């Protein structure tokens, strides 16, 4: 007979896992008057964006979570900087987002806007759909 308690982990390999996160826009659910929840793909997309935009020491009690992507935006725009940006994004996502399997990261310099167009392609674990997250990284003072 299996022993189920709060310290055991789920070793199930089922394909349809439901992911939930809070909506950080803090929109109100009209039925429950609670904060809206993001589910599945939208929750994972929001988490990916948040990890990229989080700097080290920004999260209380978890200073190790974050990336130096924002600091890299103040460097010269060269192909080498774009490659380093891709590596930093890959590092933070591999280390802190276990729900995804990365396929490709593309950072394209936009010289006119002095920013980068960042495209991230990944699969959500347990899903066969290729997800694309595109974001525009620019310097903020």
Place the predicted regions along the sequence by residue.
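Immediate N-terminus of the mature polypeptide
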Residues: 1-86, 91, 103, 108-141
